[in-house]
């Protein structure tokens, strides 16, 4: 997870990471969880993706600690629902290139080795693959980190990303589209019988935002969520074009964004109110994402 410089943001992450380490919940091994062992008759399920899928800082952590892979992320919750045999290789900071390249890992700027290419988990007999990717290719979390302000009269950061009439975020999203297509084609090549499920990203902030609770101006709240929505559209289009099934997580997330009460939120804001990374799903969110994916699988 790339951390912003917002003091409250960094302090909250360091506190949670320290608590996990002290209680022994942060396991710094590179092993695939024991649940990955193939069982006779069980659906063979591989989970690929970035921190939205890995569930950083949601206890308990399994695998490389810098990947932030939670035993309560949507993959683990879904595998439990399906009775599937899971290989979860999701990892915070992963981009599309890390499907076929190893990923250098660090936490709070401390090097922590590397994670193997995520595609190493795929097998010819894999039955189900889930994928959540794109946020790091397009840098959307980094953009959100740079849009915070406690000054209601500040210049909207939206202007910075549209200087000279150039839609910088739109360019990044457009550049990501063919990369996703290649990833999906490669999954089919490696696991030709697998059902491939691709999720979009959720609803992070409601229209107009909730400044100063979440310290982004109303126009920037709409700019940020609008960028997520545009990327979701690209993910849906590429999924349809490359034989994958798209799961919309944003629409069902209405009323569960970072502006809501702690018990209602599926995603955390800049300073979390639950054990989860800033600007990422909490356990409630991961469980609901698993329910949405499970309902899709069982209904079609």
Task: Report residues per predicted region.
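Serine-esterase "nucleophile elbow" of acetyl-processing enzymes
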Residues: 36-94, 148-154
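Charged, often glycine-rich, active-site loop that binds/positions anionic groups
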Residues: 94-116, 258-273
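Catalytic His-Asp segment of secreted/periplasmic serine-dependent ester chemistry enzymes
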Residues: 201-300
